[in-house]
Each structure stands twice: as C-alpha cells, then as structure tokens.
Amino acid sequence: MASVYENSYMIVLIFLLLGILLPVVALTLGRMLRPNKPSAAKATTYESGIEPFHDANIRFHARYYIFALLFVIFDVETLFLYPWAVAYDNLGLFALIEMLIFVVMLLVGLAYAWKKKVLQWL
C-alpha cells in the first residue's frame, strides 16, 4: 500500500521538476540563440507606431494598489469557496462552520478597511 502513495508522490515530483526545468531550458536556449544587436530604436518605448511624445514611466496613485490587493484577496476567497461549494453535501456541518469562520474573517477585514476609509477614492 505504501508503494501506491510513493508512486503518486513520484508523479507529482516529476511534474514539478518538469514544470521548473522546461521553462528554464526554454528561456536559456532563447537567450543563447537570439541575435544580440542592441540599438537606440530598440530601446525606445513602442506607442502604436507613433513617435513617443512623453516619458513611459507613469506614476500611479497608491490607491490603485490598495484596490488591486483587495481584489486579489476576495478573488482568492472565491477560489477557496468553489471547491467547498462543490463538495458541500459530503463535508457536513464542521466544514460549514469552518467556511463561515473564513468568510467572517474576510468580512471583518473588509469592514476594517471600510472603517479606515481605505475604500474611499478622495
């Protein structure tokens, strides 16, 4: 019985190694085989074929990052909720309570951000 588990983990390990090794090999080969002829035209920013008329380095307001982080947090929450919702019939009351605690913790964080006026734009 132990060999079945070891075989399963070996398959995961092989996929993990291939998932790391293949991109590294592809990027290394691409770097070695590409022509390296730097020029001033290649260093400029591309703006739909038009000559760039201002600097490409634009500063974003910090609030964009806060909204992006909040989006990522609640997006990951839905990733955790989906498998639970699919297998809800088999999990029982304990899993329901665990998921409610998880959702309440996220809602408390959202209420805290709302109270600190992080979600107000100006």
UniProtKB/Swiss-Prot annotation:
UniProt catalytic activity: a quinone + NADH + 5 H(+)(in) = a quinol + NAD(+) + 4 H(+)(out)
EC number(s) stated in the UniProt entry for this protein: 7.1.1.-
Any Pfam family the entry gives: Oxidored_q4
Membrane topology: Multi-pass membrane protein
Top class in the EC scheme: translocase
Keyword Chaperone belongs to the record: no
InterPro entries: NAD(P)H_OxRDtase_bac/plastid (IPR023043), NADH_UbQ/plastoQ_OxRdtase_su3 (IPR000440), NDAH_ubi_oxred_su3_sf (IPR038430)
GO CC list: NADH dehydrogenase complex; plasma membrane
Main location as per UniProt: membrane
Spans traversing the lipid bilayer: 10-30, 66-86, 91-111
Record key words, sorted: Cell membrane, Membrane, NAD, Quinone, Translocase, Transmembrane, Transmembrane helix, Transport
Coiled coil spans: none
A molecular function GO annotation: quinone binding
Compartments where located: Cell membrane
Keyword Signal applies: no
Primary role: NDH-1 shuttles electrons from NADH, via FMN and iron-sulfur (Fe-S) centers, to quinones in the respiratory chain. The immediate electron acceptor for the enzyme in this species is believed to be a menaquinone. Couples the redox reaction to proton translocation (for every two electrons transferred, four hydrogen ions are translocated across the cytoplasmic membrane), and thus conserves the redox energy in a proton gradient.
Family: Belongs to the complex I subunit 3 family.
Subunit comment: NDH-1 is composed of 14 different subunits. Subunits NuoA, H, J, K, L, M, N constitute the membrane sector of the complex.
Protein name (record): NADH-quinone oxidoreductase subunit A
Organism: Bacillus anthracis
